[in-house]
């Protein structure tokens, strides 16, 4: 068994509906994301150096006895067993919402997007890369009816009532760690299995 498979087996025993999963990969696409996502702007508009470790994000839900992973993948919104998704990654961590009263609503909204076959927004990736490196936002470069993984999960967080992430226009997966439990929204989430 690989390290991620062992970690998955440990996590699966404690996984909860609505957990958010951050993924690390060593692919070329992930290397490019890390190149562009090496800082963030804090609430005081200060540029903070913060190298990116995680480059993909999803949420999980139980369907019968299977832990499924819902995310915006290169083919659009997908819903696959988490055991399939780990084959593409080398590490992951969990962001667990502490308030669960709206989790089922958020899960169902995401599954509705999957059933509607919402496509992936490749141009939004380019838009974020340009903003991260130049500070220039080309707003017409993305499609509001398509998703990338971080926008899909930001919408999920909105649907379950999390406030920590609503201020950021163009989030990356790593931003979900950077902005978890901002001081004004203490204890909205807990971070688990983060070996980074």
Per-range role (PLM):
Residues 1-6:
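Short, structured beta-strand/loop micro-motifs enriched in basic residues and often containing a Trp
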Residues 131-196:
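Activation targets extended, charge/polar-rich intrinsically disordered C-terminal tails
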Residues 51, 100-104, 146, 150:
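Solvent-exposed, acidic/flexible segments
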Residues 101-134:
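A structural motif
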